[in-house]
Swiss-Prot record:
PROSITE patterns for the chain: FH2, PDZ
Region ranges (Disordered): 28-82, 170-193, 322-369, 414-635, 990-1009
Subcellular location per the Swiss-Prot or TrEMBL entry: Postsynaptic cell membrane
Annotated protein name in UniProt: Delphilin
Keywords: Cell membrane, Membrane, Postsynaptic cell membrane, Synapse
One GO term describing the cellular component: postsynaptic membrane
Compositional bias annotation for Polar residues: 322-332, 557-602
Length: 1009
């Protein structure tokens, strides 16, 4: 479509309509030819929208060999090059031109490949041209948009111009496969998955050299998996590449690879992991397979890895939960526990009638699920959909039921059905994790097993005779339910006095179901499992008004438990619970006393003492739950919180939690200061050290001592012999800079204690002060090492001043230019060239010639001056060659070189005085060395004085020559004016010559001759 830019604007509308109609016709022909072969393999150029549509790398060919003629084969290739075969044209297509001008379109888009219009704003150009909600955008200005991603379509629409042409199709919105249920579209053709096309790069990420059983990664995916399974695998890998979370990858991929043949895909996935991630992945999957083998279900995985063995923690758990059925009702054992012991053979139904224990699948959409998603979307601020890569915080897997008739760990059908009255998903539930229907599978507990609490129960005011004889049996239809599973038991009960993070309450029907099942597999009829009743609150706002749902309002904040032998721990929901007010808790507790008394009376005659640890005596429920010992610890400061999604319990977590206690995380992330003073060990306490130098000076002196790498005695010898071989000028400057001042010298002289009590820099300075005339020796050493360099710099500076003064005074071409400037200025100022002439001007006006612009504003006075000199006085244009030293003299700082010369003379005088003051000895050679040095450098200093005198005399003369006061004007200011004038004149001259003489002159036309 690059030819569109060559079409005149008045004909572009017809061009767009013709192109759109042509594309639609070709699309229809492609459909009619492609119907006998509805499964066409897309070319790589169509799978990746980043490549141009005209790519010749591959073309679409029939997936299966057929009897079509070669002509139809070629037609298929041609049509599929421009129109992808995944799309089916319909009669609802229409071409619309949007006259938007500089406005926005006025609609919002959703989805990709193709995108569709989610909403149309009233009064917008989109509404004016007839676009409606649900229209799919197929073509934009003749360009195919059906395989493009959402971001690319948006960018193409933004650059589509003022009157873009759209080909849209009406009809219901087709959500991508990721937003729909895989069970609803099992027969979708492979060529109709644009979402899978966008993930094709994942299947091609491994090189073709990596093969298993003779096939590459993409070939094995296509050979072994269905369309939905391939999408799930690719989407899981794409998410893993972003977050590198192996646990999430296993949760997403493991349920798909559920056969020995499919599990070959793991060998390709391992190639994308690091060595540590491979070991972690193998360990996790071994736990899955180990649990399934315990349930008499062979995994058939052909890969090699080591299975995890039960440890001491598992033995403790087996002693605590003695029920053989508890493993079957706990979906977390496969993640957090080693393989359980096999079940007795009489407990299991025949193998062909049994379903697999644990699978990973998503629940079907229901009315309660939609309510839950709406509530969650309001909290999060954006729409939350059920997609395949949806990662629930805890419940990424669920449990399938056995075929047994009257299992005690089964729930009745009405408890798990989506249409249940007593246990429907409420609107205030905000848990991200959910299971089939409206039931929630709780995660493993987060705390070790505490001693059991007293037997207590809190229910609604109406008492119920809950006995196994009076309660009905569960309907047998539940055992054949393919999705709904009984809620699992946590391996360990919660603390009695600790506020739970996941508190739920069972309904009355749940309590009936718990006692209605006869015990079939219990070896000890007297033992009873634990039933936990929690408060089903999700929002932090506590509502005191009664709930309108048939579910009874349980508001007790205390964990109540009942002991039963062969039943699992039933929990209906899992939500976060705030603390209730004391008055409300007390009121609800009073209402629940009748049922509590009746229920306890029923159980008191049947419940024997549980195994150790023994139960504490029963007591009344407190008004508020007691805080945990960790929360009541006064030394535990408030720390920052980390926001994450909770996963299932890990058997190694408690070992890590014990180790974390010794990491001192409160010191790093604490938000409160501990009022108690911190006690430092003895070796870190500051000793009694005497400090005389200031803190900053002592710190810098310590750094200097480390750099010198000289002992105090060695430095003292250097100062006595005045040797310059081991000291750099920079070190001598720092020694002078950090030397003690007069006040500190007095403190050192009065110090009569042990020198070892002084700090290290103070000890160093104390030894240096024992050298007579310490600072004078340092200054003399510095002068001895730097005087030659200083004299050379000053000599060069004075020579520049001297030469520049002579050049300005003797330049004839500069004088001629200044006369021309004066004449032009007189003409402009007076109007007539011969009346009231000005005889001179200040030289600083030379820097302002470019500020006076011409009438048209295109040139300046300096440009006119350069142009006039080019035409009338071309010999004056090279005046800058007469002033070569002037730019160098402009950089000389007169004050600096004058101060340096004065410092040289003062230092020489101080050294001579010190030579007279310090007597010459065999050890102290200061006087002999420095006297000889002064005699040697005297001629150079005397020559420098003479040059300085001559340079300044010449400068005074040239300043007076140009009408400046030499006593006020400095050298850098004076020479800087001429240096700036030379630079600006050269620039204006080059601009003028460039305008008059262009680089590529054109030959005059013969017609102009």
């Amino acid at each position: 479509m690059f030819a569109r830019i060559f079409i005149p604007k008045k004909h572009r509308q017809r061009f767009d309509e013709a192109v759109s109609q042509s594309l639609i016709n070709r699309m229809c022909r492609s459909k009619s030819l492609g119907e006998p072969q509805n499964r066409l393999r897309r070319s790589r150029s169509q799978d990746h929208h980043e490549r141009p549509q005209g790519s010749k790398r591959a073309s679409s060919v029939p997936r299966d060999t057929g009897d079509e003629p070669a002509q139809n084969d070629r037609t298929l290739r041609k049509s599929n090059t421009m129109i992808p075969t995944q799309y089916v044209s319909g009669v609802n297509q229409r071409t619309i031109r949007v006259y938007r001008g500089k406005k926005s379109f006025g609609f919002t888009l959703r989805g990709h490949a193709p995108v569709w219009i989610d909403s149309v704003m009233p009064g917008s150009p989109a509404e004016a041209c007839g676009l409606k909600t649900g229209d799919r955008i197929l073509f934009l200005n003749g360009l195919d948009m059906r395989n493009c991603s959402h971001e690319k379509v948006v960018s193409m629409l933004q650059g589509s111009g003022a009157m873009p042409s759209l080909v849209v199709e009406e009809g219901p919105v087709d959500y991508p496969q990721s937003d729909s249920e895989p069970e609803e579209t099992p027969s979708a053709p492979r060529s109709r998955s644009p979402a899978l096309s966008s993930l094709q790069w994942v299947a091609e990420i491994l090189p073709p050299s990596i093969r298993v059983h003779g096939r590459t990664f993409s070939q094995q995916l296509e050979h072994l998996l269905t369309l939905q399974e391939r999408y799930t695998i690719c989407k899981a890998l794409e998410t893993f590449f972003q977050h590198r979370n192996v646990d999430t990858l296993i949760v997403d991929v493991f349920p798909v690879l559920d056969t020995p043949a499919k599990q070959l895909i793991w060998q390709f996935i391992y190639q994308l992991l690091t060595y540590e991630e491979q070991e972690h992945c193998k360990t996790k999957i071994a736990r899955f397979l180990g649990f399934k083998s315990a349930g008499n279900r062979k995994s058939g995985l052909s890969l090699t890895w080591t299975d995890s063995f039960p440890g001491p923690q598992f033995e403790t758990y087996q002693q605590t939960v003695a029920s053989p059925d508890s493993v079957d009702s706990n979906p977390y054992v496969s993640l957090d526990s080693p393989p359980a012991s096999p079940l007795p053979s009489d407990e299991l139904s025949p193998l062909p009638q049994r379903r697999k224990l644990f699978t990973f699948s998503r629940p079907p959409r229901s009315r309660d699920t939609d309510k839950f998603l709406d509530a969650l979307s309001e909290q999060l601020g954006h729409r939350v959909n059920i997609v395949d890569d949806f990662k629930g915080g805890e419940n990424d897997y669920e449990e399938m039921s056995f075929q047994d008739e009257q299992e005690v760990n089964m729930l009745p059908h009405e408890l798990s059905s989506a249409s249940s009255e007593d246990h429907s998903s409420s609107d205030d539930s905000t848990s991200v994790s959910y299971s089939s229907g409206s039931d929630h599978i709780p995660p493993p507990p987060q705390s070790p097993p505490p001693p059991p609490p007293p037997l207590q129960f809190t229910d609604s005011p109406s008492p119920l005779p809950i006995t196994p004889e009076h309660l009905p049996q569960p309907p047998p239809a539940f055992q054949h339910h393919p999705i709904i599973a009984p809620p699992p038991p946590p391996p360990r009960p919660f603390l009695a006095n600790r506020p739970s993070l996941h508190k739920v309450l069972p309904t009355r029907e749940e309590l009936r179901a718990q006692h209605s099942h006869p015990r079939r597999s219990s070896p000890q009829p007297s033992s009873q499992p634990i039933l936990q009743l929690h408060q089903p609150k999700a929002h932090p706002i506590l509502q005191s008004s009664p709930h309108t749902s048939p579910q009874p309002p349980h508001t007790s904040a205390q964990h109540t438990r009942l002991q039963h032998p062969s039943q699992s721990i039933y929990q209906s929901q899992q939500t976060t619970v705030p603390r209730t007010s004391p008055s409300l808790t007390k009121q609800k507790s009073l209402h629940s006393q009748p049922s509590q008394q009746s229920f306890e009376g029923t159980l008191s005659s049947k419940v024997p003492p549980p195994p150790p640890p023994p139960l504490p005596p029963p007591c009344d429920p407190p008004p508020l739950p007691k805080p945990s010992p960790k929360a009541s610890d006064n030394n535990h400061m408030s720390v920052k919180r980390l926001r994450w999604e909770q996963l299932g319990d890990d058997p190694d977590y408690h070992k890590l939690s014990d180790m974390v206690k010794y990491l001192d995380l409160d010191l790093y992330f604490g938000t409160q200061r501990n009022s108690k003073p911190t006690f430092l060990p003895e070796n870190l306490k500051k000793k009694d050290v005497v400090e005389i130098l200031s803190h900053k000076k002592a710190y810098n002196a310590s750094i200097l001592i480390a750099h010198l790498k000289l002992a105090p005695k060695e430095l003292r010898d250097i100062l006595m012999t005045m040797s310059t071989e081991r000291l750099e000028p920079a070190h001598i400057k720092q020694l002078l800079l950090y030397a003690p001042d007069d006040e500190e010298v007095k403190q050192f002289q009065h110090y009569d204690q042990d020198p070892a009590k002084l700090s290290e820099p103070d000890q160093f300075v104390l030894q240096m002060l024992l050298v007579p005339e310490y600072k004078t020796r340092l200054r003399s050493l510095l002068f001895k090492t730097t005087v030659q360099e200083k004299t050379e710099e000053m000599r060069a500076a004075y020579e520049c001043i001297y030469k520049a003064s002579l050049e300005l005074k003797n330049s004839k071409r500069l004088a001629k230019i200044l006369e021309f400037v004066l004449a032009m200025g007189n003409y402009l100022n007076n109007g007539q060239p011969k009346t009231n002439k000005t005889t001179g001007f200040k030289i600083n006006f030379l820097t302002e010639l470019n500020t006076t612009k011409t009438v048209d504003g295109k040139s300046t006075f300096l440009h006119i001056l350069a142009k006039s000199l080019c035409q009338h006085f071309p010999e004056l244009l090279g005046f800058s060659r007469d002033l070569i030293t002037v730019p160098l003299a402009a950089k000389v700082n007169q004050r600096t070189i004058t101060a340096d010369l004065s410092d040289v003379h003062s230092t020489i005088q101080d050294i001579r005085t010190a030579c007279v003051k310090i007597p010459a000895t065999a050890e102290d050679r200061f006087a002999a060395v420095m006297s000889s040095f002064l005699e040697n450098c005297h001629p150079a200093v005397q020559s420098l004085d003479s040059l300085q005198q001559r340079a300044m005399d010449e400068f005074h003369k040239v300043a007076s020559y140009f009408g400046e006061d030499s006593k006020v004007t400095t050298t850098e200011t004076f020479f800087g004016i001429f240096a700036e004038f030379i630079s600006k004149f050269e620039r204006a001259l080059s601009e003028t010559q460039g305008t008059e003489n262009p680089k590529s002159p054109r030959i005059a036309s013969p017609l102009a001759w």
